[in-house]
Amino acid sequence: MAFAYDVAVDANSGNNAHAFMLGMVGFNKSVLEVGCAAGHVTKVLAQRGCTVVGLERDPAAARSAATWARRVVVGDVEDVGTWAELGEERYGAVMLGDVLEHLRDPLAALRRAVGHVAPGGMVVISLPNIAHGDVRMALLRGAFPYRETGLLDRTHLRFFTRETMRELCAEAGLVIVDTKRVVMPLFQTELGVIRDDFDQTLIDGILEDPEAETYQFVVQAVVDNGDHAVVALADRLAELSDHVHHEGVRRALLLRDLRERAEMEEEIRWLRRSLEEAEGRYAAILGTKTFRLVAPLRRLYGMMTRPEQPGSRPAPKRP
């Protein structure tokens, strides 16, 4: 049976939200998976020695996920009663993968999730980046193209940037300790934005934002226990992470420019070679005996077909 958001989980991918989240959770943890869907991630967690409890609103999907989970609570994440079924259970990791953007009140749901984090535990969240360059360029064209999945999934109710994601976590009592990014180059998302519709200067301006090609944010956060030293250290780690990301983006853009320049230079070299070959063929034609024999006839033909100059008079006829 096919379910909404059925996906294949590649835990070893270097540019995938599921892989990033699984890497943050690790092995042999107790996990609360909020929005477990049909259990694709649940299965990998179980294979890694994790004990999983899921929350899922779709009963059919929940039954599928139950194959790998210790149990699955069926209900709406925004319903207090759904959380009440968990009792006082706490977990080493609480996962919310592409969940919060679908909620009317993501902050309330996140606060409830934080209440189920065990001491020393973590919260792992993935969110799409509404500030991706393709969304910005679509807006410049007056478009907001909803899709079945992706950045503008038609079921999204809330939208997040890097800053609003951080604000959400802080308001929920979390401190972000690690941030990873799923990267999707401009003009390669499901939105169908076309490069030829935009001036290169505009594109370059958008790319000056290091997050312009960030498709999803994946963050690992811990509960803020009021330890200012921990918060300061987390903030410093976030700054360093951003610096590494920004430097990586800068170098990637530089490499892209160098590659484009190299391609242009190669095209110029090809054109030069083509011109030299054409000149060689033309010189060879000039040197042929046939060309020399017909040269006087070509000159005569040119004189006969030359247009008459303004003001010129025909030569007088001889008596």
Give each language-model segment a name.
Residues G35-A37:
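Class I SAM-dependent methyltransferase "Motif I" SAM/SAH-binding loop
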Residues D224-P319:
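Boundary detector for helix-to-coil junctions that initiate low-complexity/charged tails
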Residues H40, V44-G81:
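Class I SAM-dependent methyltransferase SAM/SAH-binding core
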Residues A93-V99:
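A short beta-strand submotif of the Rossmann-like class I SAM-dependent methyltransferase core
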Residues N12-K29:
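Conserved alpha-helix/loop element of class I SAM-dependent methyltransferases that forms part
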Residues V7, N15-N16, H40, A60-R63, ...:
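S-adenosyl-L-methionine-dependent methyltransferase catalytic module, highlighting the catalytic core
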Residues W83-A93:
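A short acidic, Gly/Pro-enriched loop at the edge of an enzyme's catalytic core
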